[in-house]
């Protein structure tokens, strides 16, 4: 078990996680940021919904080269992933949108709970959400809020 865990990257939900190790892992990863985030040896615990919504929140395109991330962009991404994942643990489901006044995240219908993941249109700006295969999974991005030339 210890050897298996040693192959995992830092887990954003763990207080003892080393973000510097995650940063180094991303900088050493060839290929797209969106694919790198699904690689559990780079950062542990990120699945497709977390990838889509965290990249959206940070305005980062999934196809951007992982090694092109600046340290400031990485720091924001690390914090955002930890926040979204932590809320999901607390709520028992993934809700990335801010609930309307007077409603809790848990009251938001499942099909309205995310900005771009499995959405036809971006829930922030209304642009059609692009989707394509990346890292063996479907990637989602808003062409307005996550332009391909974002890095």
What is the meaning of each model-derived region?
Residues 49, 61, 138:
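Gly/Ser/Thr-rich beta-alpha loop segments that engage phosphate groups in nucleotides
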Residues 73-90:
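Basic, amphipathic alpha-helical segments enriched in Lys/Arg and hydrophobic/aromatic residues
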Residues 1-6, 16, 74, 143-151:
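Acidic, proline/glycine-enriched N-terminal capping motif
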Residues 59-68, 74:
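RNA substrate-recognition surfaces in RNA-acting enzymes
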Residues 1-57, 65:
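Phosphate/anion-contacting hairpin/loop surfaces
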Residues 31, 64, 90-94:
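Intrinsically disordered or highly flexible coil/loop and linker segments, enriched in small
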Residues 89-151:
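C-terminal accessory segment of soluble enzyme catalytic cores
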């Amino acid at each position: 078990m210890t050897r298996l865990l040693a192959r995992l990257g830092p887990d954003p939900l763990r207080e003892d996680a080393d973000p510097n190790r995650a940063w180094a892992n991303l900088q050493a990863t060839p290929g797209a940021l969106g694919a790198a985030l699904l690689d559990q040896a780079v950062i542990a615990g990120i699945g497709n919904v977390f990838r889509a919504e965290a990249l959206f929140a940070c305005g980062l395109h999934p196809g951007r080269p992982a090694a092109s991330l600046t340290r400031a962009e990485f720091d924001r991404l690390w914090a955002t992933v930890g926040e979204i994942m932590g809320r999901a643990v607390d709520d028992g489901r993934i809700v990335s949108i801010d609930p309307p006044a007077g409603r809790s995240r848990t009251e938001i219908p499942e099909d309205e709970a995310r900005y771009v993941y499995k959405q036809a249109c971006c829930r922030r700006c209304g642009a059609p959400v692009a989707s394509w295969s990346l890292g063996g999974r479907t990637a989602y991005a808003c062409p307005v809020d996550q332009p391909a030339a974002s890095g």
